[in-house]
Amino acid sequence: MREVILAVHGMTCSACTNTINTQLRALKGVTKCDISLVTNECQVTYDNEVTADSIKEIIEDCGFDCEILRDSEITAISTKEGLLSVQGMTCGSCVSTVTKQVEGIEGVESVVVSLVTEECHVIYEPSKTTLETAREMIEDCGFDSNIIMDGNGNADMTEKTVILKVTKAFEDESPLILSSVSERFQFLLDLGVKSIEISDDMHTLTIKYCCNELGIRDLLRHLERTGYKFTVFSNLDNTTQLRLLSKEDEIRFWKKNSIKSTLLAIICMLLYMIVPMMWPTIVQDRIFPYKETSFVRGLFYRDILGVILASYIQFSVGFYFYKAAWASLKHGSGTMDTLVCVSTTCAYTFSVFSLVHNMFHPSSTGKLPRIVFDTSIMIISYISIGKYLETLAKSQTSTALSKLIQLTPSVCSIISDVERNETKEIPIELLQVNDIVEIKPGMKIPADGIITRGESEIDESLMTGESILVPKKTGFPVIAGSVNGPGHFYFRTTTVGEETKLANIIKVMKEAQLSKAPIQGYADYLASIFVPGILILAVLTFFIWCFILNISANPPVAFTANTKADNFFICLQTATSVVIVACPCALGLATPTAIMVGTGVGAQNGVLIKGGEVLEKFNSITTFVFDKTGTLTTGFMVVKKFLKDSNWVGNVDEDEVLACIKATESISDHPVSKAIIRYCDGLNCNKALNAVVLESEYVLGKGIVSKCQVNGNTYDICIGNEALILEDALKKSGFINSNVDQGNTVSYVSVNGHVFGLFEINDEVKHDSYATVQYLQRNGYETYMITGDNNSAAKRVAREVGISFENVYSDVSPTGKCDLVKKIQDKEGNNKVAVVGDGINDAPALALSDLGIAISTGTEIAIEAADIVILCGNDLNTNSLRGLANAIDISLKTFKRIKLNLFWALCYNIFMIPIAMGVLIPWGITLPPMLAGLAMAFSSVSVVLSSLMLKKWTPPDIESHGISDFKSKFSIGNFWSRLFSTRAIAGEQDIESQAGLMSNEEVL
């Protein structure tokens, strides 16, 4: 499978995107097609039955200019791995039954079932089976089962693909020599290169390589041996992306057309409107150009000038509309260009017909013929001006994305010789992992990494939304795209290119434009039938008024003062107004422009929103479920003290045990593990000891079990909660945690099967957690907390943030979190639940919830499972929950703006089309085509300007007032649902055991 990304120019509304989508999906070999009207990008997935060039031709056949930005192969994932819970197994026979039955499923490659953890790990081929099939098979065996995790299996995360442009082209070689060209690259296969592919046009080389063995600069250096020169084709070509987002070409095109058509329109208006109205004697006295020509009777100089000017505008500036209209009609669809083309052609053709008719049948009184060249020119002029303003406004909707792209520098300085401290400047595309990069004051940081030398203050507003300089020193992480302050430092790169956090943010924002809100489906449907419907209405309008004039003894005032020819003209003019006043673009732009601005504002304030569907989901959320550690609390846990069991009688070296504890905890990335490691690092006694982990097992929901060796001694180490440290062992030891401060987390340690002691660990609540939770409650949301921590710790945090104890669940496993989320969803019939977590052990619950919200810190984003990612910093000041309030406010206001845009677009068409059809003609009110064109041009502009109003968004004051004024104050449906709603009450029993080294106390 391959994926091609194309830039498509000339799309104006959803009818254009629907036309392209329909044609591409009908093409054999195309499996997926996504089009963004705002970013002008088309992303197509296809197989070997079609080529990128043929896809480009299809788009061009639809009447749009198109260029290929990137064409690359998609790495196929042959297998996936999944994790299922299996409840009810009692012995090895149960394990054997489950293993045998699941292994018998076609496509399953490996099955491992654990009786202790009650889990089943499956590796399977997604092309042949699914994890759901395995779950059903387990349940058929008589056991309860749930899917915990379903992710990639053998996808090699170290494998990278690079596309190189050949500057010394292969076509210079003869076919005989060309066959040996491929052989020149074979030596690369021994250096870490997985595959080499030469493009059909011989201009590009696609290489897959292992980035652990080979860097991009190393690859280019080896390629020099072939005798050819290469440059890296960057997927993040900033210049191309910025050019597309700024719409420079479109702005330039419509600006030129607007100037030309407006200048000529002014001349035509002088000839046909202003002079006859202001100085009628000039027309009556037949002063030039209102004088009849001497060589053709009935032909006036005014009309010669008019037909020349109108023909130029109609077939020069208007050629764009003809081309687009013909392309859409070829595929059985219509766009706004079709309506413009039909209306201007009607006015132009009528004028030419009147001119020719007057030449063959001149008036005996020398009366000037009825000519409306000014109408066709003015319509094109108004539309061109409207398009120019609309494109300008649309370019402003993507400023947030443009600013993020601009944060990536084009070059950077790396240490080329460590001993001599020599630096060299390289393009950012050539940056490799583990490079040492020099950052001077004011420079942009090119990659994610860790500071190795020096210190500074850095602007990380792309993460937090606040331009507060964050102090950084040796060992602190830095993020690509952040801007250095006054200091000078060096850092080692950890992720580069498309794997950086900035690249992920840009990717999420761009993909958000491809995700349509369900409400947009209605707009797309209306747009698909809009043009045919308007043309039918225009024809009906013409014939109905002609019929009324023929049978009516008392025609409307607009017709009584005119001849039959004039009445025919008014009927035609009325029908033309119907065609030109209709505006499908307003409907098509209502949703995507608001989504682009809303997601851009969110990104600027540390909130990543994954498209329109997420925005619509947020509008129906009634309940928020919080994780505790890392979400309501800072996640920076600290060991307050270590209590050794007074009954311990084992003959072991305590320093060696602490060294083994540190080595064991190094396996996990859990906040509790990090706290214990820091505590062990602070003890001088074990710094000289080097413990080696021989075996280890992470027991989900309970802790870690390992076998360690230090100084030739072997220890069986077990660290975790009471469920892991067998209750019998605790009872035998007589060791209880009565001396532990209530509200702290407890992690027990056993050595060689006997309880050794416990760690008492504390985690502080975030400084704005209380204000955020109260903000939600003030605005009618139900709040819950589900944690794997013990009862006392859960109560302490709930008390501090203001969550009712009846809505708090403790000692809950990841699977248990899913069960509780389902339980809360089922309350009151249709409860919509948003889960807020930090991504550690939360992925299943985030995926199961109606809306998953991940709190992201550090340099990794929990993007996959969450619908919304809230970015925050690592330090206590920027590690904030306030972003949740921002996410709610932005999402609700953006969705409200979408509905307002659609309401305005529908009201405009519903109101203006009947007026254009002549419902007010009995009262002498008509809508001339020129005014209709002006109204239509500015209707779409007004929708874009409405979306741009979202840029004025300011963060809500969570300390005082909330969002009820725009969420539901004026919603009748919400009023009645709240009036008869009841408060959700927690169940009597919590679900037990959660991942993470926690003690297992009484259930709330």
UniProtKB/Swiss-Prot annotation:
<feature type="transmembrane region" description="Helical">
    <location>
        <begin position="304"/>
        <end position="324"/>
    </location>
</feature>
<keyword id="KW-0067">ATP-binding</keyword>
<dbReference type="GO" id="GO:0055085">
    <property type="term" value="P:transmembrane transport"/>
</dbReference>
<dbReference type="Pfam" id="PF00403">
    <property type="entry name" value="HMA"/>
</dbReference>
<dbReference type="GO" id="GO:0012510">
    <property type="term" value="C:trans-Golgi network transport vesicle membrane"/>
</dbReference>
<feature type="topological domain" description="Lumenal, vesicle">
    <location>
        <begin position="925"/>
        <end position="927"/>
    </location>
</feature>
<keyword id="KW-0812">Transmembrane</keyword>
<keyword id="KW-0406">Ion transport</keyword>
<keyword id="KW-0813">Transport</keyword>
<dbReference type="InterPro" id="IPR027256">
    <property type="entry name" value="P-typ_ATPase_IB"/>
</dbReference>
<feature type="topological domain" description="Cytoplasmic">
    <location>
        <begin position="599"/>
        <end position="901"/>
    </location>
</feature>
<feature type="topological domain" description="Cytoplasmic">
    <location>
        <begin position="392"/>
        <end position="528"/>
    </location>
</feature>
<feature type="topological domain" description="Lumenal, vesicle">
    <location>
        <begin position="357"/>
        <end position="370"/>
    </location>
</feature>
<feature type="transmembrane region" description="Helical">
    <location>
        <begin position="902"/>
        <end position="924"/>
    </location>
</feature>
<dbReference type="GO" id="GO:0005524">
    <property type="term" value="F:ATP binding"/>
</dbReference>
<feature type="topological domain" description="Cytoplasmic">
    <location>
        <begin position="951"/>
        <end position="1004"/>
    </location>
</feature>
<keyword id="KW-0479">Metal-binding</keyword>
<dbReference type="GO" id="GO:0140581">
    <property type="term" value="F:P-type monovalent copper transporter activity"/>
</dbReference>
<feature type="binding site">
    <location>
        <position position="16"/>
    </location>
    <ligand>
        <name>Cu(+) 1</name>
    </ligand>
</feature>
<feature type="binding site">
    <location>
        <position position="838"/>
    </location>
    <ligand>
        <name>Mg(2+)</name>
    </ligand>
</feature>
<dbReference type="GO" id="GO:0016020">
    <property type="term" value="C:membrane"/>
</dbReference>
<dbReference type="GO" id="GO:0060003">
    <property type="term" value="P:copper ion export"/>
</dbReference>
<feature type="binding site">
    <location>
        <position position="13"/>
    </location>
    <ligand>
        <name>Cu(+) 1</name>
    </ligand>
</feature>
<comment type="similarity">
    <text>Belongs to the cation transport ATPase (P-type) (TC 3.A.3) family. Type IB subfamily.</text>
</comment>
<dbReference type="Pfam" id="PF00702">
    <property type="entry name" value="Hydrolase"/>
</dbReference>
<dbReference type="InterPro" id="IPR023299">
    <property type="entry name" value="ATPase_P-typ_cyto_dom_N"/>
</dbReference>
<feature type="binding site">
    <location>
        <position position="842"/>
    </location>
    <ligand>
        <name>Mg(2+)</name>
    </ligand>
</feature>
<dbReference type="InterPro" id="IPR023214">
    <property type="entry name" value="HAD_sf"/>
</dbReference>
<dbReference type="GO" id="GO:0006879">
    <property type="term" value="P:intracellular iron ion homeostasis"/>
</dbReference>
<dbReference type="InterPro" id="IPR036163">
    <property type="entry name" value="HMA_dom_sf"/>
</dbReference>
<feature type="topological domain" description="Cytoplasmic">
    <location>
        <begin position="325"/>
        <end position="335"/>
    </location>
</feature>
<keyword id="KW-0460">Magnesium</keyword>
<dbReference type="InterPro" id="IPR001757">
    <property type="entry name" value="P_typ_ATPase"/>
</dbReference>
<dbReference type="InterPro" id="IPR006121">
    <property type="entry name" value="HMA_dom"/>
</dbReference>
<comment type="subunit">
    <text>Interacts with the copper chaperone ATX1 via the copper anion.</text>
</comment>
<keyword id="KW-0677">Repeat</keyword>
<keyword id="KW-0547">Nucleotide-binding</keyword>
<keyword id="KW-0186">Copper</keyword>
<feature type="transmembrane region" description="Helical">
    <location>
        <begin position="928"/>
        <end position="950"/>
    </location>
</feature>
<dbReference type="InterPro" id="IPR017969">
    <property type="entry name" value="Heavy-metal-associated_CS"/>
</dbReference>
<dbReference type="GO" id="GO:0055070">
    <property type="term" value="P:copper ion homeostasis"/>
</dbReference>
<dbReference type="GO" id="GO:0005507">
    <property type="term" value="F:copper ion binding"/>
</dbReference>
